[in-house]
A protein has these predicted regions:
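Gly/Ala-rich beta-loop-alpha elbow adjacent to hydrolase catalytic centers
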Residues: 55-59, 63
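Catalytic histidine-centered segment of alpha/beta-hydrolase-like enzymes
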Residues: 230-243
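Conserved loop-alpha-helix segment in the C-terminal half of the alpha/beta-hydrolase fold
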Residues: 189-230
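Alpha/beta-hydrolase
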Residues: 115-204
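Aromatic pocket-lining residues of Rossmann-like dinucleotide-binding sites
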Residues: 6, 66-70
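Active-site loop/oxyanion-hole signature of alpha/beta-hydrolase fold enzymes
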Residues: 14-54, 68, 84, 93-96, ...
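Flexible "cap/lid" loop of the alpha/beta hydrolase fold
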Residues: 68, 75-117, 210
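Short, surface-exposed "cap/lid" segments of acyl-processing enzymes
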Residues: 1-11, 15
């Protein structure tokens, strides 16, 4: 739904289907290879032309890291419920990672046990629709999630029953991503701040925003922080509101680009 709305507004919308699944870009601490995967994708799809970087959660963090690494690729940066982790909280994450205790406090404690196989797409839909977090999603978004987020399962437990599906995004890779959350964002932003305008969309009930806080994010985006009703997954809960908010920001960014040849670096306090 989001992509359709943005394309209908005249934008060319592209995205990497699954981060972390390409052997050339493994998941490691602080996600340098995932950042490079995004940069390679941008440079291949839009050579020499900066783009609007829009990302939710993981996508927002990687977009920020990409904009810091190679400022020339970013026309603007819009982070969707990807609160910037710095200071003592970032140091705590670093220590927990080093001690191999991060799984006790990160979402990986759930993802490592996540169900990943079903006898049919209908069974997968019923499974997620019954879960509280997914029940809040717009029905059409959940349908898209099943259609695009699952794939035929060649290792279905019941070989006599065709139609089995599994999660397309492997749970062990999702778990590894959670366990390698970047703890160096503050250092990256201090040394190589984005040279493009930056904005942030936050969920009013986002646990992630509440846990991380918004001090570093506000220092990065200044007045360009907007709230949308919902949890961390508000783009799936309120897709129309999210799509409209993104389009407003992109229009604002385009106007800024036309009026000024280059934006000053956005440096956190």
């Amino acid at each position: 739904m989001l992509f359709e709305a943005w394309r209908a507004a005249g934008h060319r919308v592209l995205a990497i289907e699954r981060f972390g699944h390409a052997p050339a870009y493994p998941v490691t601490s602080n996600w340098p290879h995932l950042r490079d995967q995004l940069l390679q994708f941008i440079e291949a799809e839009s050579p020499g032309q900066p783009v609007h970087l829009v990302g939710h959660s993981l996508g927002g963090f990687l977009s920020m890291l990409a904009a810091c690494r190679k400022p020339a690729v970013a026309k603007s940066l819009l982070m969707i419920d990807s609160p910037v982790l710095t200071g003592w909280k970032a140091h705590s994450v670093q220590v927990m990672k080093a001690a191999r205790l991060i799984q006790k406090v990160s979402p990986s404690r759930v993802s490592v046990k996540r169900r990943w196989q079903w006898p049919s797409a209908e069974a997968a839909h019923a499974h997620f629709a019954a879960k509280h977090n997914f029940a809040r999603w717009a029905p059409e978004v959940l349908r898209d999630y099943i259609a695009c987020g699952t794939e035929p399962d060649p290792d279905a437990p019941d070989a006599a029953q065709p139609g089995g599906v599994r999660l397309a995004f492997r749970r062990e890779i999702e778990t590894r991503i959670y366990n390698t959350l970047p703890h160096h964002m503050g250092r990256v932003l201090h040394r190589h701040p984005p040279r493009c305008p930056v904005a942030f969309l936050a969920g009013t009930q986002s646990v992630e925003v509440r846990q991380v806080g918004l001090a570093a994010t506000r220092a990065l985006v200044h007045e360009r922080l907007e709230w949308i009703e919902g949890s961390h997954l508000f783009p799936m809960e309120k897709p129309a509101d999210t799509a409209a908010a993104v389009l407003r920001r992109l229009a604002e960014f385009d106007a800024l680009t036309r009026s000024a040849p280059a934006a000053p670096p956005s440096r956190p306090a």
